[in-house]
């Protein structure tokens, strides 16, 4: 039986609601009460830097309150005033609706029950009879108000030329850099010994990039009266985290892609990397996954499945009245 190469994990990194993965800082934050004072201090120092806080000042309680699962912060969206379009049906047979508007705002296809009259070169008068449905931009309170968010104040897109990249890809670049930093070697030392086509990258996003800089913007721009840009579609691809690791961090030429399987996406990518090393297709494998699903649209989808704790549900679990605030940390 021939010898088989043994894959060895030589570094890891990332970022999540508990902070940086490297140095076991995220693990320390999640197991805070069980950690020694020395390990807590190291993690506090790391989070102080991440969150842009002034070193040397006591920030422990602030850091604890602004990491892990908590009330969704305004940097994502206002949970008390989420934008949406309310359907507004109107029926006007006896008293037609009249309004004036600029000619350039007329729809390309005039509805059959509209009567358009010229007022001037630039403006027209519109009369509507019969039934007409409008979409009224308004606000509403979001049912789900808690999520695991990156530490308050940490914005990965500010650490490199992000150029309006979706948040998941910003996190990917930071996470890959964090993993390389934990390696203990300069990446140039590795590439001097390993050919660029012997380095494989497997990383993806099961949901894709669905915020406003990716597929989210592509899908809702026209409905909001905006234009679709050329970046929305390509930046939303599910395998784009692997492409970004290559483009911004590694510059390798080996196998690149992603296997997707909901919560198991990372494990599938890990298997791909292990198979590459065992088979000899690669000497180095870089694997990961990135998800940034804190948007009203995605969270509403999961909430409809019953997969997220609503504010009302938390109150019912704790026996609270409508006036009492639930403990969002327990969501």
Predicted regions span which residues?
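Short pre-catalytic strand/loop immediately N-terminal to key active-site residues, enriched for Gly-Thr
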Residues: 254-261
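Conserved "HGTGT" condensation-loop signature of ketosynthase/thiolase-family condensing enzymes
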Residues: 1-254, 275, 290, 294, ...
């Amino acid at each position: 039986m021939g010898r088989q190469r043994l894959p060895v994990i030589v570094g890891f990194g990332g970022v999540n609601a508990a902070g940086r993965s490297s140095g076991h800082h995220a693990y320390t934050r999640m197991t805070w009460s069980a950690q020694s004072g020395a390990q807590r201090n190291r993690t506090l120092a790391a989070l102080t830097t991440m969150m842009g806080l002034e070193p040397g000042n006591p920030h422990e309680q602030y850091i604890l309150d602004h990491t892990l699962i908590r009330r969704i912060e305004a940097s994502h969206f206002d949970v008390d005033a989420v934008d949406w379009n309310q359907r507004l049906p109107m029926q006007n047979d006896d008293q037609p609706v009249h309004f004036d508007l600029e000619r350039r705002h007329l729809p390309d296809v005039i509805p059959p029950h509209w009567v358009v009259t010229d007022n001037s070169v630039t403006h027209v008068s519109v009369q509507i009879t019969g039934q007409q449905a409008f979409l009224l931009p308004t606000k509403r309170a979001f049912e789900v108000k808690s999520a695991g968010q990156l530490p308050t104040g940490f914005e990965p897109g500010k650490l490199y030329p992000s150029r309006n990249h979706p948040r998941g890809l910003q996190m990917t670049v930071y996470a890959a850099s964090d993993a390389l930093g934990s390696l203990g070697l300069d990446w140039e030392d590795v590439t001097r010994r390993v050919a660029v086509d012997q380095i494989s990258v497997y990383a993806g996003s099961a949901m894709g990039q669905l915020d406003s800089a990716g597929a989210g913007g592509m899908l809702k721009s026209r409905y909001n009266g905006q234009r679709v840009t050329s970046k929305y579609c390509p930046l939303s691809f599910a395998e784009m985290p692997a492409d970004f690791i290559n483009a911004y961090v590694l510059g390798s030429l080996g196998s690149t892609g992603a296997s997707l399987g909901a919560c198991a996406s990372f494990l599938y990518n890990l298997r791909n990397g292990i198979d590459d090393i065992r088979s000899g297709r690669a000497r180095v494998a870089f694997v990961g996954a990135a998800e940034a699903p804190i948007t009203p649209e995605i969270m509403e989808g999961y909430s409809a499945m019953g997969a997220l704790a609503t504010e009302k549900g938390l109150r019912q679990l704790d026996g609270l009245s409508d006036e009492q605030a639930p403990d969002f940390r327990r969501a």
